[in-house]
Curated annotation (Swiss-Prot):
Name the record gives this protein: Mu-theraphotoxin-Cg1a
InterPro entries cross-referenced by the UniProt entry: Huwentoxin-1
Organism superkingdom: Eukaryota
Organism: Chilobrachys guangxiensis
Record's GO cellular component terms: extracellular region
Pfam families on file: Toxin_12 (PF07740)
Chief location bin: secreted
Propeptide: 22-50
Comment field (misc): Negative results: does not inhibit TTX-resistant sodium currents on rat dorsal root ganglion (DRG) neurons. Has no activity on voltage-gated potassium channel Kv2.1/KCNB1 expressed in frog oocytes. Does not show activity towards Nav1.1/SCN1A, Nav1.2/SCN2A, Nav1.4/SCN4A, Nav1.5/SCN5A, Nav1.6/SCN8A, Nav1.8/SCN10A sodium channel.
UniProt key word Ribonucleoprotein: no
């Protein structure tokens, strides 16, 4: 019984390795180095431009700042916390 379980586990392990290798071969290793793949990764990690200014970002009015921030009334004008904590 123990031998049968060990043989079954060995066969399942071999099948896993074989299917993983076949899948890798199907995709191709050069796909990871292709310019299209690099461009898609750049697009994913590209910083998004926000419609509002973050903390200490320059502003001219309160609407320029993100939620829970307001534009400082005196020079230098930048976004500061408005002392609110609600969502």
């Amino acid at each position: 019984m123990k031998v049968l379980v060990l043989i079954t586990l060995a066969v399942l392990g071999a099948m896993f390795v074989w299917t993983s290798a076949a899948e890798l071969e199907e995709r191709g290793s050069d796909q990871r180095d292709s310019p299209a793949w690099v461009k898609s990764m750049e697009r994913i990690f590209q910083s998004e431009e926000r419609a509002c200014r973050e903390w200490l970002g320059g502003c001219s009015k309160d609407a320029d700042c993100c939620a829970h921030l307001e534009c400082r009334k005196k020079w230098p004008y930048h976004c500061v916390w408005d002392w609110t904590v609600r969502k």
